[in-house]
Amino acid sequence: AGGIGVTPFASMARHCIKSEENRDAVLLYSSKNASEVVYQDVFSSASRCGWRIAYRIGVIDTEYIKQEVPDYAERTFYISGPPSMVNAMKSMLIGLGVSRFNIKTDFFHGLA
């Protein structure tokens, strides 16, 4: 997720917390700077439900994906954020060998 595009993931996390449903989920959350990071309390609570959050100031690249999600080839990816970020992430994942059928996208334009 990029920037405020993390909002749909906060909703998913709240659902898991409320239903006490465990999920093997890894959230890669990038932001331009630390002051833009939102929903930290929600994601902290989601760790009780099996979520792991990896915060990144700056751009998520292939090495970061490999480091944080070693089993990336078997995962389903949900990408939400500004269109340029979503398209770049999708291309990057396809380049890593992730099936395009395992990549779900949501363009989140934010307030701009």
What are these regions (language model features)?
Residues A1-A112:
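FNR/FR-type flavoprotein reductase catalytic core
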